[in-house]
């Protein structure tokens, strides 16, 4: 990986390309981020930078977090994320990373926390088929069906059942960067991005591009 940045999902809209086609895009307010820590192969065994994003008050942070920022000599921030990079020679503690590190036409991987939908049935959670509505099926029609009554007489782990749906970390790969607005710290990517409006997302160059 060569670059990364922390951002906030603003929502979706649409823009028109040069041929007049409608392109659905997600707007992300990316950065500016501050380098809170730099890791090197010599000292840490791998090369990485730790980015900090969005100003925070001291009362909202732990003593360990406050001490970490004070040691680096940077302002207090809410969010921290480490990005492993091939080369960290261009970064030092206190360096600022902005959205113009990316460019239109590139492909990126974006990680976020999906919307939490609470306790959900197996039909909606796993897209299973409903049971037949007639001919002896009842009184329920939205259950997953038989799970092994006699043999093996138990339910295997990871069986698709009802439970918590959403609120999990998901990465969407190979999203196309349509536009960059360096003045407003905006990046527009084609397609949807996991999470609700205002959710924190991590943008990095694509590993499969």
Question: Which sequence ranges carry the predicted segments?
Answer:
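Extended basic (Lys/Arg/His-rich) segments that typically form rRNA-contacting surfaces
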Residues: 1-209
